[in-house]
A protein has these predicted regions:
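Interfacial loop-to-helix junctions that mark the boundaries of transmembrane helices
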Residues: 1-6, 25-31, 54-66, 197-205, ...
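Membrane-interface interhelical connector segments
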Residues: 164-199, 433-454, 481-488, 492-493
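Structural signal for alpha-helical transmembrane segments and their membrane-water exit/capping regions
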Residues: 2-7, 17-53, 74-85, 276-287, ...
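Transmembrane helical segments that form the transport core of multi-pass membrane transport proteins
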Residues: 268, 298-464
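Membrane-embedded alpha-helical segments and adjacent helix-loop junctions characteristic
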Residues: 55-63, 67-140, 145-146, 395-489
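Long, contiguous bundles of hydrophobic transmembrane helices that form the permeation core
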Residues: 1-10, 211-363, 530-540, 548, ...
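Alpha-helical transmembrane segments of multi-pass membrane proteins
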Residues: 103-115, 141-154, 167, 181-214, ...
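Re-entrant/interfacial helical elements at transmembrane boundaries that shape
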Residues: 125-133, 149, 162-174, 220, ...
């Protein structure tokens, strides 16, 4: 079959998502079953894989969906526990002392705290922690979800202590003789040095693209959720937003160059938190209290902004609790994530031991395997911390029981969307080996694009990485699928293939901004079920920016300078954004 036709067919399940979820605004619970059926139809009818393989991929998807629902439940339970104990009210007052300005708060929580959680745990965990915290502070649920999705970009490639590089890129490249020969020819004696070399390039690309992410967060927040529906209110804090961005990305790049791929996100975010919180307390670059920006009265909020989990001041207990005690559950979450993710501490191997791992190998006689390691899942940490909080905050049994009951009802509503979303993904990426002889759908699509773009491939490479993450819900899986393909394309068009692999990793991180099952999960955490398409519509421009800028920059780098198509496009993008911002600010009174 013609590669272009095959690529268009492979695009169909994604086109169904785009049409019904994003354009027609169907809820994910209705759109994703259609996408699943489309993927199954293609797998059986065009790729001609066996019914057993489709069934095995579906079962694996259901198992993964169950683990996601467990994580969502744990995150909701922790939020409801803090609501019932009164800690949320204390945390809210604490943030008011740092700054009552919602723009400052969202940058600290979503951009910095969220990046720290991403660096510690990865795999969408920031949405499970930062998004409900924002709702607890009084943000509309949809505003919190949009902010939580936007920051799942810069820190993602080094999330989970570098998993997308150390597992994703590593798995994709390490067994290929041509890649090994290339690394040795470039003087890398150790494979780990070669991975770190790619990691530095990834960090540089992220730092340049990520410099505007905090500004995107506040500008989109004021545009979609402010009383004035204006970008201006967000753009007014551009100095603080850029300062917060550099406070994280500068140490992020330094750490990538000196310590390797494990620590850029976690240490960059920690250093950034220390700098930005200290500066905010001292009033550096933050608006004066009388100029603080807030959402309008809740009575004026649109119904679509509000999730099933709504925290009202008059519902809160007023405990005698200090700020440290109120924050202690989140500190415990952060501590447990680090303790269980750093192998040298000795806990991670215990949690991943075969004795506490449930595996199903060769499902229905296929090569597909599924496994669950429940003690290692972030959901377990959330549940354990909730139980500790029950004792630590001296809660009553009745109020704690309410937290469990409300959490169970909320997570049930999200289950329909996820039990079709993840199986669709698994059928899509497990579609190789059929009688038709086609490669799996993601590779077929990527090869079709590569055949059309030719030497302009570096501009498109991040979009393939983003597509992989959009489908699979993981930068790591995207890198595993496409790193070798990207390396091969780079080598074929005569440019440094490590830059192309770096563009893949950056694009894979950007894909998390619009990834369907990440949006479903983040929305479910705050009870915002059925409005996933609206979230993606709001975050899609940020994804395009975050894929296009590194692509243009990468094209310029591999072609030796800025005086080429990539460099000119990069200048045009930033000039256009600057002109737009200046015009918006001129409208300001």
């Amino acid at each position: 079959m013609n590669p272009t036709v095959l690529a268009l067919l492979a695009l169909l399940p994604i086109a169904v998502v785009a049409l019904f979820l994003v354009v027609l605004r169907w809820p994910a619970s209705r759109a994703m079953p259609l996408s699943y059926l489309t993927a199954v139809g293609l797998a059986l009818g065009v790729w001609k894989i066996s019914g057993q393989q489709v069934a095995a991929a579906t079962v694996k998807g259901l198992i993964i969906a169950a683990t996601l629902l467990y994580i969502i439940f744990g995150a909701i339970l922790l939020l409801n526990t803090l609501q019932q104990s009164g800690a949320i009210r204390v945390i809210r007052k604490g943030f008011m002392n740092i700054s009552p300005d919602r723009r400052v708060q969202v940058i600290i929580i979503a951009w910095l705290f969220g990046s720290f959680i991403e660096g510690s745990a990865g795999f969408g965990t920031p949405a499970a922690v930062a998004v409900p915290l924002l709702v607890g502070l009084g943000f509309p649920a949809m505003a919190a979800v949009v902010a939580g999705m936007l920051i799942q970009s810069t820190p993602v490639s080094f999330g989970g202590l570098g998993t997308p590089i150390l597992v994703g890129v590593n798995t994709g490249l390490k067994d290929d003789a041509a890649v090994q020969a290339f690394a040795q020819a470039k003087g890398f004696e150790q494979w780990s040095e070669f991975l770190a070399h790619i990691g530095v390039k990834v960090a540089v690309l992220h730092a340049i693209a990520g410099i505007l992410i905090p500004l995107f967060v506040v500008a989109l927040m004021t545009r979609y959720f402010g009383s004035n529906r204006s970008f201006v209110d967000g753009l007014k804090v551009w100095k603080f937003a850029i300062f917060a961005s550099l406070s994280m990305t500068v140490p992020y790049v330094i750490v990538a160059r000196t310590l390797g791929p494990e620590f850029p996100s976690i240490l960059g975010a920690l250093i950034g938190l220390a700098i930005v919180v200290t500066a905010s307390k001292k009033g550096f670059l933050v608006p004066k209290k009388e100029d603080a920006w807030d959402f309008g009265p809740k009575e004026e909020w649109q119904p679509e902004w509000i999730g099933a989990i709504e925290i009202k001041d008059d519902d809160m207990v007023s405990p005698r609790m200090n700020l440290f005690l109120a924050w202690s559950p989140y500190l415990l979450v952060a501590a447990f994530l680090i303790i269980t993710r750093v192998p040298e501490l000795g806990v991670k191997p215990l949690l991943l031991h075969a004795a506490v791992t449930f595996s199903w190998t060769e499902i229905f006689g296929t090569d597909i395997t599924a496994k669950v390691q429940p003690l290692y899942l972030p959901g377990t940490i959330f549940v354990v911390v909730s139980l500790i909080t029950f004792a630590l905050h001296g809660m009553k049994g009745g109020s704690y029981g309410t937290a469990w009951a409300v959490s169970g009802r909320t997570v049930f509503k999200a289950s329909v969307a996820l039990i079709f979303t993840v199986p669709m993904v698994q059928v899509f990426i497990n579609s190789a080996g059929g009688l038709a002889g086609h490669d799996k759908m993601p590779i077929a699509l990527a090869e079709g694009v590569a055949g059309i773009t030719g030497s302009a491939w570096p501009i498109f490479a991040p979009f393939i990485g983003g597509f992989g993450a959009f489908v699979a819900g993981s930068n790591t899986v995207s890198n595993m699928m496409f790193s070798l393909f990207q390396f091969g394309v780079g080598d074929r068009i005569g440019v440094d293939p490590t830059w192309i692999v770096a563009l893949q990793a950056v694009g894979g991180a950007a894909g998390n901004i619009i990834c369907v099952h990440n949006v479903v999960a983040a929305s479910a955490v705050v009870g915002l079920v059925g409005r996933e398409g609206l979230v993606i519509r709001k975050t899609l421009p940020a994804f395009i920016y975050y894929a296009l800028v590194p692509g243009c920059l990468g094209f310029a780098i591999v072609n030796g300078g800025i005086l080429n198509v990539g460099g000119l496009m990069l200048v045009a993008i930033y000039a256009g954004l600057l002109i737009f911002a200046r015009k918006q600010l001129k409208k300001s009174p």
